[in-house]
């Protein structure tokens, strides 16, 4: 079996004691923060609440709240989204309202583009690529090079030019309620910018037409794809809230196998890398995905950064990286993890702490099906830490680190060098979280 690859202050919100969904579920104990219009602030001008995770640190996260009418856009096509985003270097505050689902794989006229369209004129063909780099003849000691690899890279670059949307600083991107708002087949790239809000969007089917074969990745090689649904690279003050991330409708079980390895067309769902910092990820729904959230792109990423809060999210049908954390100070609280296999996505682990990551995981709730092993909920390389208490497995308080360490030679440490203080909405008990979060997470909830 191959070894897994590891590459890769206007702030007011109404605090609701119980949402309508929770009341309907008969739950009355939990107090939690949920976005709503407050003091006349509409959905598009809402900003991150004080003390709501790391993104509230310092100047906080306000996105495009100060946008004027000339920089407030409603978009429903790829071309309109590109125009609304403008230049990645333009820091003028802007609000972008996404109405309906935008297909990133379309041209400026709205014509659907296929993988064949991107490959056209590059000289790339999958059959030629497979023949050229077959390990039986090419070997396994070096990366692909030569004409077909250059052609693959050229085709991939054509797709990237079309589906990667570069988000400038001081931007709010929000799905219009009631329109099934989202982006399919595309990637929001938030790179080297500050102060971005992404809310109420469904990100689906982010697919790379041209994965690269790497025979040196792991024991048996791997096919690696290039696009995350949302990618933070050197970004600061980012708030991702009430979004849904899914591979649907193309699940990994439909992927073919070449050279004995899955031809993986999906990469991350929401990756936080290249020294990104001060990020809050809350009330999102992650489902039907393999490598879901990477915090830190390598063991040598920037130290003193990668401070991330992850709370009140639902993770179901997730194989791994929920998240995989390196180096930073990461607070994971009040999340719901369901490790039931869904649509072929069989969980390997939930949280991986490696490269001296300082993780505090507390008051989260895991549902583990019959036969599942608590020892496999965590993972690590022997240098990372996971502190925290109040985590439940099937309703029972469980010491996740003790369970993992008892079964692994690479022990997870239990002490960290920091104490979370930005914890708005924290619930000491995880007991009622599955019922509470069932109807209050993901896209389509905000009004």
PLM feature spans:
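Acidic Gly/Asp/Thr-rich repetitive segments characteristic of extracellular carbohydrate-active
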Residues: 52-97
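Cleaved targeting-peptide boundary
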Residues: 39-45
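Extracellular beta-strand-rich solenoid/capping regions of secreted or surface-exposed proteins
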Residues: 83-91, 106-172, 181-199, 205, ...
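Right-handed parallel beta-helix
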Residues: 169-179, 194-207, 228, 234-251, ...
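Extracellular beta-rich repeat passengers
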Residues: 324-447
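Acidic glycine-/aspartate-rich tracts in secreted/extracellular proteins
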Residues: 79, 101-104, 178-179, 371
